[in-house]
Amino acid sequence: MGDNKNNGDSGKLLYCSFCGKSQHEVRKLIAGPSVYVCDECVELCNDIIREEIKEISPKRDSDKLPTPHELRAHLDDYVIGQDRAKKVLSVAVYNHYKRLKNASPKDGIELGKSNILLIGPTGSGKTLLAETLARSLNVPFTMADATTLTEAGYVGEDVENIIQKLLQKCDYDVEKAQRGIVYIDEIDKISRKSDNPSITRDVSGEGVQQALLKLIEGTVAAVPPQGGRKHPQQEFLQVDTSKILFICGGAFAGLEKVIEQRAHVGSGIGFGAQVKGEKEKATISETLTQVEPGDLVKYGLIPEFIGRLPVVATLTELDEEALVQILSQPKNALTKQYSALFEMEGVELEFREDALKAIAHKAMSRKTGARGLRSIVESILLDTMYDIPSVDGVVKAVVDESVVKGESAPILIYEHNEAQAASGEQ
């Protein structure tokens, strides 16, 4: 076999047996028994094989569905606490993908969708749980904010745009998008403004719930590949939303009062009433675990919408101890992330235990939950991250309680074991 452009024996002009180009039009012409192939055709064949392998690999990976125990273990690696919610989510997600895997109904039994409603305070981990599950399953994931959604035809974002975002995440591969997870945050903000239907249109409340109904339950949504109203002439993609898992989340502030009111009905009033002491009163998190569909209706969600979210999981408010764990224990804990950033400069970053407690205490006082931790850590380390790339010889930075309280700067330790504050003071 040869790869020369000339045929020394006959002087005959040779052509690629695949594309027909002559030996003078290509860089290489590889000879076989009565056959020739050029370098361009070889490269094209390699590209085709690579694409086919890329398409087959994800399918092979997705053949094995993680069990609820495996899903829960993955959540434990990234999310602290919320044990009950993790178990509920793991089972619901497992059942959803089991339903997709065995699409043909057995004995005429068609399995319903297990869309999920997460109820819990801000910063308790609702979004992180949904994101981590999608990452664990290697499926497309997108988020939407319910407060920005409006009915079609009104100023704002159409509910169909949610599917548009999901398609963008997987390069408009409809098959992949139909296995995706959509997380809709602030779902409590689209509750009806009152129990009585209003004469005027509630385009960002009940109207959005109505618009989301079919999308969540399952419909074939026609989605333009390049966005909504701007390209009416282009061909639409057909996406079956019955295969997409929808997870809705919200803080539902005040829902505990609705639950308490329902629970106390019939418990007696006046002298016959049972009076609970301070210690007997349930916490807000404990009260929320008793939520029933009727409570959500009274809160302002329409019955049809609640019916599309059969799986309900409540998350507890994170205490100071949990926030300390969140700072240091998960695989992608904040302290580990910032340590990695400092390591890129050749500097070791150390957070002392009293510093972690002080950061958690500050987040608790701000009532931001885990969501507020990053901004606190960022503000503590800002000046140090600004200075370190320009300072030679720093091998370690230490953060203690006084740094978090703003009383001092992080301690910098140099190669010759001398230590000084990041500000340059001895």
UniProtKB/Swiss-Prot annotation:
CDD domains: RecA-like_ClpX (cd19497)
Binding residues annotated for ATP, in chain numbering: P121, T122, G123, S124, G125, K126, T127, L128
Keyword annotations from UniProtKB, A to Z: ATP-binding, Chaperone, Metal-binding, Nucleotide-binding, Zinc
GO biological process: cell division; proteolysis involved in protein catabolic process
A Pfam family matched in the record: ClpB_D2-small
One GO term describing the cellular component: HslUV protease complex
Domain ClpX-type ZB positions: 4-57
Binding site for Zn(2+): C16, C19, C38, C41
Cited SMART domains: AAA, ClpB_D2-small, zf-C4_ClpX
Recorded family membership: Belongs to the ClpX chaperone family.
UniProt subunit comment: Component of the ClpX-ClpP complex. Forms a hexameric ring that, in the presence of ATP, binds to fourteen ClpP subunits assembled into a disk-like structure with a central cavity, resembling the structure of eukaryotic proteasomes.
Listed name of the protein: ATP-dependent Clp protease ATP-binding subunit ClpX
